[in-house]
Amino acid sequence: MSGRTARRRVLRVTVPAADPGGASGPARVTASARADLLAAEEPLGIRVDGTALTMTMRTPGDDVELAAGFLVGEAIVRGRDDITAMKVCDGTTCGHLDHSDDEIGNIVDIALAPGVEVTAGARRSFMTTSACGVCGKTSIDDICVLPQAPLSADTTVFEPAVIAALPDRLREAQRVFSSTGGLHAAGLFTASGDLLVVREDVGRHNAVDKIVGWALLNAKLPLAGCALLVSGRASFELVQKAVLAGIPLLAAVSAPSSLAAELADEAGLTLIGFLRGPSMNVYTGTQRLSA
């Protein structure tokens, strides 16, 4: 399996700014060949007990976390005890590993504990792109009746000034983005603004799955009292993942969708959008923000 980045030769074209003096004649366009660093994107197959569950396009790295977090977001597992073994495969051979070890392939196979089952509705035989998972696959009613929801019991209060500072802290921790400019990120923070973990990926939902998987594998679920920040927008699926991980606050630098706001409201999640500079829009769960 390759790394998180790949180098590629590109043609750099520069168009000069218009001459404010109105000089006549065509502008001179310059071009030069150079090497550029790109964010890697490869398929990852997720299997449960040897049976294919889904395939997603992701940035390689933290694949076991991604697979484990995906199972949490699909309400298949709730804690570390629901998983008995994890294997990473290269397509022909598989090796058992601790989740902290390096991955060796593009398939993750997870063995579930006795009594933990994958429902027929959760099984997928199609490709999930890096831009979005299967948004809205699970209905709001289905999610809100799960034991993980609603989140109303989590009465953590967050300071608006602390929330406003999170985007800068997330950007400082985005090591691969700083070299490629091509990755989304998700960061998990305490209510006091301390960064617990950050993950980067070509897909926002993958980055969130990696964080949730990290929490599951380290026996930290549910993530009560935490805030999750994502780059880009907040979709229904990201709200679903936050709710099922027990995260009481989800913030995004862009807008949420209408269905995301509806689910957040029903599940008791504080949903924040347009978190930029000193301002933010609070769509649901305003009681968790101090006056």
Question: How would you name each of these model-derived features?
Answer:
Residues 229, 250-251, 272:
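Structural detector of well-ordered beta-strand residues that form the stable sheet scaffold
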Residues 208, 239, 260-261:
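Generic hydrophobic/aromatic pocket-lining and core-packing "Φ" positions
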